[in-house]
Amino acid sequence: MNFLNIFEDHVAGIFGATRAPFSFKKLAKQAARDMEDQTLVINGVNTAPALYTILIAADDDPMLAPFYPELSREVREFVKAQAEKRRYVFVGEPLVRFMIDPQLRAGKFSVFAENVDAPTPVSYTHLTLP
């Protein structure tokens, strides 16, 4: 069974009998395409983007919101499996976040992969607030 079928089975398990507002298989394919497009060669190493932003329609948010943690985990695991298959590395752990795009119609989504620096520990005692 390939990664996409495994992903699809896991997401179907999350939703159960509830009908998803769009195809998560298409979402996974879009995330993999964006990962491929945004992968950079850094010091001779193929470095995959570690931040994945999924924009959804405001109308879909109430139905999807309870599932965001599980969906984020499944998309993250899918992206990690795709990167491993291609021998890509990440700077840090991949992060998947959902955001509302008021311009999107119900049932539509967009995925953006971005290269970001690894998280740096911050000591809040050294922060100066304006």
PLM ranges: what are they?
Residues T125-P130:
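Conserved small/polar residues in nucleotide/adenosyl-binding loops
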